[in-house]
C-alpha cells in the first residue's frame, strides 16, 4: 500500500518520512491551515528530496492559473484539489490532479469512479482534522483507485488493508503538534502500512 505523509513543513520531517519509506509528501498551500507552507519554503525542501518521491501540493479554492504557477515554481508533481470541482476544471490544470472527495455518506465514495481520488471524512476544515470515515462504506467497493485519509494512525492503519486501497494519507495521526511530525509515529505508521 502506498503512503503519503501530508502537512510537511520542514526538511527534517520530509527526509525522515522518505527514509522510512513514504511514497509521497504533501505540502499544504492553504494559508488558513496550521500546516501551511509557502511555495518558496516548499521548493527549498523539494530541491533536497531524492528522486522517485511524489511531491503533492494541496490546494483549497484556488484557480487553475494559481495552481499551475505554484506547482511549476515549487516542482510539485501532483495537485491535490481539496474543494468541489468538476471533471472539466480538473482537466484544465496542466499537471496530474487528485480530486478529494469529502464524504458525508456512503454514496460519496463513488464520486470520480474513473479517476484516482482521495476520500476523506467531511468536516468544515480542509484536512488534518483526525476525523475518521465509516469503513463499512467501502464494503464491496473497488478501492484500487482510492487513497484513504481521515483519522488514520499507526495503531489503526492495519484495519484498512482488507479493502485494497491504492494508498493511505496521514497528517495529524503522525504529529507531535500541528505542523510538526513525531518521528517515531511516522516510522511506525509506515512500517505498519507497508507490512503484509
UniProtKB/Swiss-Prot annotation:
Keywords: Amino-acid biosynthesis, Aromatic amino acid biosynthesis, Isomerase, Tryptophan biosynthesis. InterPro entries: Aldolase_TIM, PRAI_dom, RibuloseP-bd_barrel, TrpF_fam. The keyword 4Fe-4S does not apply. Its EC number is 5.3.1.24. It catalyses: N-(5-phospho-beta-D-ribosyl)anthranilate = 1-(2-carboxyphenylamino)-1-deoxy-D-ribulose 5-phosphate. It comes from the Bacteria. This is N-(5'-phosphoribosyl)anthranilate isomerase. The lineage of its organism: Bacteria, Pseudomonadati, Campylobacterota, Epsilonproteobacteria, Campylobacterales. Pfam families: PRAI. It is an enzyme of class 5 (isomerase). One of its GO terms (biological process) is L-tryptophan biosynthetic process. The gene is trpF. Pathway: Amino-acid biosynthesis; L-tryptophan biosynthesis; L-tryptophan from chorismate: step 3/5. Belongs to the TrpF family. GO terms for molecular function: phosphoribosylanthranilate isomerase activity. CDD domains: PRAI (cd00405).
